[in-house]
């Protein structure tokens, strides 16, 4: 069974607007509406939307029988956001995490991520000519995945990496919940980063698969 968690609690400060960023429009629809369509196209059994900034407006936009909203009262990071919804997921389900302001990822790429998570955890990366602002995918000398480092925590060498973390990942609800409970906030932003679960999966000798998207994220 597939469940989707959509993160929609952000403020959209980079858009210089008081409107929640997921409510900005694309092709006449709020960004989050496009992401909901994607979740339904993937035949998700249940859809969870994590709300925060402008919660009432976002909830009104996403309201539907197949959508359950969860409040992130404090903005403590993406890992903390997922924690607000993971407890409502069936432990045996596969959980796909999407961002409510990233509407243009193809269904095929997301299906690849879900399929790759069968035995462990999978994430979606992309190659950018200008990766500024994104977390970087760190690999060893043999090209094997090591982890994701956020830009504010990255070394100059790591900031030169063009492979970025899109934020999309999938894993079983049971494993994801356990890893989230181990994530700490010892980083430059004092936040609980969702990508830290990838490193915890490696520590547990669980397979980590990186699916590289053909989408243009520039």
Task: Describe the residue ranges of each PLM region.
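Conserved N-terminal catalytic core of the sugar/cofactor nucleotidyltransferase
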Residues: 29-112
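Structural beta-sheet core signal
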Residues: 4-6, 48-49, 96-97, 123-124, ...
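Short aromatic/basic micro-patch
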Residues: 25, 104, 170
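Catalytic-core segments of class I nucleotidyltransferases/pyrophosphorylases
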Residues: 145-218
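Conserved donor-nucleotide/metal-binding helix-loop-beta segment in metal-dependent transferases, i.e.
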Residues: 108-132
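Short glycine-enriched, charge-decorated loop/helix-capping segments at active-site entrances
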Residues: 19-25, 183-186
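Acceptor/aglycone-binding surface of glycosyltransferases and processive sugar-polymer synthases
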Residues: 128, 134-147
């Amino acid at each position: 069974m597939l469940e989707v968690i959509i993160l929609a609690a952000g403020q959209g400060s980079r858009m210089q607007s008081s409107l929640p960023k997921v409510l900005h429009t694309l092709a006449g629809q709020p960004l989050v509406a496009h992401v909901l369509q994607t979740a339904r196209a993937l035949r998700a059994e249940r859809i969870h939307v994590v709300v925060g900034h402008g919660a009432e407006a976002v909830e009104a936009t996403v309201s539907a029988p197949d959508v359950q909203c969860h409040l992130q009262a404090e903005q403590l990071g993406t890992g903390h956001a997922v924690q607000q919804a993971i407890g409502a997921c069936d432990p045996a389900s596969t959980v796909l995490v999407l961002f409510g302001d990233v509407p243009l990822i193809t269904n095929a790429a997301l299906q690849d991520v879900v399929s790759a998570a069968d035995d462990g955890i999978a994430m979606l990366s992309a190659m950018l000519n200008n990766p500024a602002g994104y977390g970087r995918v760190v690999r060893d000398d043999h090209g094997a995945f090591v982890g994701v480092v956020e830009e504010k925590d990255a070394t100059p060498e790591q900031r030169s990496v063009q492979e970025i973390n899109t934020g999309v990942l999938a894993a079983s609800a049971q494993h994801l919940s356990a890893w989230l409970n181990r994530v700490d906030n010892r980083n430059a932003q004092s936040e609980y980063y969702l990508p830290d679960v990838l490193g915890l999966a490696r520590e547990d000798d669980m397979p980590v698969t990186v699916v590289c998207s053909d989408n243009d994220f520039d």
